[in-house]
């Protein structure tokens, strides 16, 4: 047992001071040569008032371990931290605490920064960013102005998702299961003037370029499904007796002969005007009732509701009259907000037609045979066309591809590609966000704030609580709202909505590398040298929010020449969540939060870092158990004692020590590269136990093996690794050592254990030379089971290094 005990407090204090004086992550090597960069980034946090718990630590530790590993491989590491401080999370906390968001956000950042420093991550705080800093949001506003000038930012009034608790509009991506993803309140609809970003213009590129990315397939599929590309046709249905037509989008234009009615979303622009005197009251009531429901409520598999408008359209393929209905299962923001209904071949349409006694005409049949008295829709995608005029007898699978072009040739529609992705609702009726840099002029219309006048600063207010009226609190500040038009000088008014919390986070990763530049978002020189991000780490919950928006922003900035790449993150890793007991998410309200502060005090940062990884596979959720950190702490003490007991002994490396050293390097390296980090920690434990056994026999372990252990430990437990490295006589930092390499030949066993079988059943296990020939192996095997060889030997089998099998009769 070492005479000097492992003292984590003294060791961690010592090395943090040394790293402060002599940073280990430098851009140039000893010869003055610039190192190749590696940009590893963890998603920056909301500065929550509750501070960090052990669940938050997991992602930070994973990110730092990977960064330090790359540092040991000779890279200059860009590893940064900042604050996603605008938006609903920060503002809702401020309202709850009764403190202005500017004050509460600054206090929260100070506390979380203190906690993050306890992790001892390799952060370059000179690169720190904060989305609420005017020097940062100047460029968030600059991007918006550029998008406006390119026609990607536009105003529109339409029914949006409305959170009655947060009192603001929400993008579709912010609604989960019909609830606000931030506060959990039921989402309703509200007609409001909104700023939109035309992300749909990039839909094809966002979809196709997923193939470029080294991302989890799960995330790529989530984005592909969200973008939702489909092929079909837009078909024009003339409204009977009116000089108007209703356009529908369908992926099955081959079923047009079976369209016996139409359904419009209650928000459709023609919905009210299609009503007649008899139906008007019912139609207007239905439109109002639908406006009070969320999209999720409307799409649920429950009994369909609807109202007949009193008007008819003409099916353009056969001239048949089809009644026009309204139903809330059709959404205004998908397709055209109107659908043609083919009840014989769609479950929802069949249910609706059956309920309201609408004709059902089968147009696709298996083997061309019509079903008598249909009791359910025939939804097989293939079959023979029937009741379809000149299309009868054709295979539906062939006609499905041809029909869009036939419809186009006849002048009744167009072949179309459609996307489920909708334009991004970009404005929020809240105070704590980036002001949208637009001036509303009665003469000139919407005019952007001149770029040289950015940032347009968020004014100080006394009343920052949301109004709930659809107006932002900024609307009440007359001296800020009233201004002159930048274009003509006339009296004008500023835009009073603010940007969503995603505005800054959609591009922040670019700013880290040039955060003091007041002339450009990022200089082209810095961008070419340090971007894009090589490894991005964060939760999968951002798959169709932040990750999609960041890809959109990057493609736009590529298009206008700011950067020379169009994807922000080469590689993505999604870590799982650490939960309390029984898999319950940690939260202050549930009383199951585990603070890292006490654990760092009692066990040390290194122990907590390693346990964060050991708790389970990093991509899966894991349940926290305080007892586990005790085991990791004992492991570090055993490593400490092994080194301290051997460091002054003159031990020559034996073949067994060399083999164990190379096996350790192999196991740690291959598991780390595969990101199965929990098994890296178990590899350390297994090999350390083996080294302890060898040390007992040999009186210690050689310095090269112990030094290798220190280097391998350095990304995981940097303080103790530095201390052990120094104790072993090295004068420079362990992070200048370089990552060790393994030799597969050195790992080979001299002796191997091989089972000996008779007719496939093991009768003995023998040790033979790893290089034994077939004859030598069989001779040793037969000798071991000589007393059991009582019959005629039919066959002798040796699978090298695996098994010996004697077949007897």
What kind of region is each of these model predictions?
Residues 1-41, 71-80, 104-111, 215, ...:
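Conserved oxyanion/phosphate-binding beta-strand-loop segments in alpha/beta enzyme cores
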Residues 1-22, 27-37, 265-268, 277-280, ...:
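Basic, alpha-helical terminal appendages of large translation-related enzymes
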Residues 5, 14, 18-22, 96-246, ...:
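Residue patterns forming the tRNA-binding/recognition surfaces of aminoacyl-tRNA synthetases
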Residues 30-99, 105, 128-143, 166, ...:
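N-terminal catalytic cores of NTP/NDP-binding nucleotidyl/phosphoryl-transfer enzymes
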Residues 63, 76, 268-367, 372, ...:
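Catalytic alpha/beta core of large soluble enzyme barrels
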Residues 149-161, 415-444, 501, 566, ...:
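Helix-rich, typically C-terminal accessory recognition domains appended to large enzymatic cores
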Residues 200, 205-229, 265-307, 452-484, ...:
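Amphipathic alpha-helical
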Residues 311-317, 321-334, 363, 481-618:
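Alpha-helical recognition segments enriched in aromatics with Gly/Pro capping
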């Amino acid at each position: 047992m070492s005479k000097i005990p492992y003292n984590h407090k003294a060791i961690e204090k010592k090395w943090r001071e040394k790293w402060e004086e002599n940073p280990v992550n430098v851009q140039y090597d000893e010869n003055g040569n610039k190192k190749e960069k590696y940009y590893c980034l963890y998603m920056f946090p909301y500065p929550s008032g509750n501070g960090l718990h052990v669940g938050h630590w997991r992602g930070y530790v994973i990110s730092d371990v990977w960064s330090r590993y790359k540092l040991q491989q000779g890279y200059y590491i860009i590893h940064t931290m900042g604050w996603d401080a605008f938006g609903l999370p920060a503002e809702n906390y401020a309202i709850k605490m009764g403190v202005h968001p500017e004050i509460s956000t600054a206090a929260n950042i100070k506390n979380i920064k203190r906690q993050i420093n306890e992790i001892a991550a390799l952060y370059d705080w000179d690169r720190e960013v904060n989305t609420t800093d005017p020097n940062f949001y100047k460029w968030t506003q600059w991007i918006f102005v550029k998008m406006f000038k390119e026609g990607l930012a536009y105003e529109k009034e339409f029914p949006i998702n409305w959170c009655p608790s947060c009192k603001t509009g929400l993008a579709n991506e912010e609604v989960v299961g019909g609830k606000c993803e931030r506060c959990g309140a039921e989402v309703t609809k509200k007609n409001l003037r909104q700023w939109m970003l035309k992300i749909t213009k990039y839909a094809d590129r966002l979809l196709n370029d997923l193939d470029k990315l080294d991302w989890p397939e799960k995330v790529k599929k989530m984005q592909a499904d969200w973008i939702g590309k489909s092929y079909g046709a837009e078909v024009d249905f003339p409204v009977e007796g009116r000089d108007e037509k209703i356009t529908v989008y369908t992926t099955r234009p081959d079923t047009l002969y079976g369209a016996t009615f139409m359904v419009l979303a209650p928000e459709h622009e023609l919905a009210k005007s299609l009503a007649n005197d008899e139906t008007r009251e019912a139609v207007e009531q239905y439109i109002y009732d639908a406006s009070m429901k969320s999209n999720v409520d409307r799409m649920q598999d429950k009994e369909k509701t609807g109202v007949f408008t009193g008007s008819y359209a003409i099916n353009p393929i056969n001239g048949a009259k089809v009644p026009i209905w309204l139903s809330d299962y059709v959404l205004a923001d998908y397709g055209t907000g109107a659908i043609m209904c083919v009840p014989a071949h769609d479950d929802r349409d069949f249910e609706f037609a059956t309920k309201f006694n609408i004709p059902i005409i089968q147009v696709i049949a298996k083997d061309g045979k019509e079903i008598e008295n249909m009791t359910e829709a025939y939804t097989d995608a293939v079959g023979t066309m029937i009741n379809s005029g000149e299309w009868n007898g054709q295979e539906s699978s062939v006609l499905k591809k041809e029909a869009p072009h036939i419809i186009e040739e006849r002048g009744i529609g167009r072949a179309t590609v459609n996307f489920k992705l909708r334009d991004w609702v970009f404005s929020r009726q809240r105070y704590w966000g980036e002001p949208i840099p637009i001036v509303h002029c009665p003469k000139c219309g919407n005019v952007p704030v001149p770029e040289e006048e950015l940032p347009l600063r968020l004014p100080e207010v006394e009343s920052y609580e949301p109004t709930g009226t659809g107006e932002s609190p900024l609307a009440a500040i007359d001296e800020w709202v009233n201004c002159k038009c930048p274009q003509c000088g006339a009296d004008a008014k500023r835009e009073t909505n603010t940007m969503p919390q995603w505005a800054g986070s959609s591009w922040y990763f670019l700013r880290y590398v040039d955060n003091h530049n007041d002339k450009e978002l990022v200089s082209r020189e810095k961008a070419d040298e340090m971007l894009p991000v090589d490894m991005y780490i964060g939760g999968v919950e951002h798959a169709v929010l932040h990750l999609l928006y960041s890809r959109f922003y990057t493609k736009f900035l590529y298009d206008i020449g700011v950067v020379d790449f169009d994807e922000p993150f080469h590689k993505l890793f999604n870590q799982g969540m650490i939960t309390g007991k029984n898999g319950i998410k940690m939260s202050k309200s549930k009383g199951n939060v585990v603070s890292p502060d006490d654990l760092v005090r009692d066990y040390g940062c290194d122990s907590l870092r390693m346990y964060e990884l050991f708790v389970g596979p990093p991509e899966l959720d894991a349940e926290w158990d305080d007892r586990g950190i005790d085991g990791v702490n004992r492991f570090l003490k055993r490593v400490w004692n092994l080194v301290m007991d051997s460091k002054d002994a003159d031990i020559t490396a034996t073949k067994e020590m060399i083999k164990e050293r190379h096996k350790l390097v192999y196991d740690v390296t291959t598991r780390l590269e595969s990101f199965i980090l929990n098994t890296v920690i178990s590899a350390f434990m297994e090999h350390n136990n083996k080294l302890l056994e060898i040390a007992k026999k040999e009186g210690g372990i050689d310095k090269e093996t112990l030094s290798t252990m220190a280097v391998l430990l350095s990304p995981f437990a940097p303080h103790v690794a530095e201390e052990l490295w120094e104790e072993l006589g090295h004068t420079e930092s362990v992070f200048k050592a370089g990552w060790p390499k393994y030799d597969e030949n050195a790992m080979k066993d001299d002796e191997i254990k091989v089972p000996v079988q008779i007719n496939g059943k093991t009768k003995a296990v023998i040790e033979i030379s790893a290089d034994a020939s077939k004859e030598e192996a069989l001779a040793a095997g037969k000798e071991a089971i000589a007393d059991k060889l009582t019959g005629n030997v039919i066959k002798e089998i040796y699978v090298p290094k695996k098994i010996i099998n004697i077949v007897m009769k």
